[in-house]
Amino acid sequence: MSRLLYISNLGKQIQYIEKAVATYPELLQGEVDLCNMKKPPQWDADFESRLRAADVVLVTNMGVGLDSPFLERLERWLYAHHPKYWIDVVEPKKTDILYRNLDEDKRILLESYRRTSGVMNYVRLINGAFSTKPTSEWEEPDPIPWQAIMGREGNIYKTYDEFMDAEGHRDWSSIAVYFYRDEWIMGDIEYQQALFEEIYKHQYNPIIFYGQYGSNPRVGIPNMK
């Protein structure tokens, strides 16, 4: 069976991979080895064996670049020894993207799955990493709104007017609070619902809204508005 080694220091991505593997094992077309880079693993024979056992290696990292000791060594090892990988490293002033044997149309769709988020999109990401089919035969990402206003029950509205018509009071002032989109997707909305009730109790419209930080037209992420 094919194996994907997913190396990341991004907490939400790690959660999505874990949940995809735990929830939908029957949908996955290969095995997943997850390496949490929040604390870089020791580079030893065991780690190299994990690299060698993987048919595909995907690396996502935020905060330090490929000039950091571990990532520099990883990039050099993959370049010398591995047939298929994709490294996407973001640091404050630049982004480094390196890859081998992943065509641009496949990278764009894999990135779209990853950035759109959601457990099923990570199932598609895992399967897409293994796939030899043309992307015309791949599934599109689930259409999860990039920005929305949350209602009392955790439901969402695409516009302010939609929210006001359904749950708002036109004669009240409004208080807006931003939260992260991935929190809504994962159902981590306890504090958002508590804020909603507290703001509403004082007769203000609670505009509890999420968005996606940073636009990316290449994969359809709009500017927040």
Residue positions per predicted region:
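An N-terminal assembly and electron-transfer interface module characteristic of large anaerobic redox
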Residues: 1-225
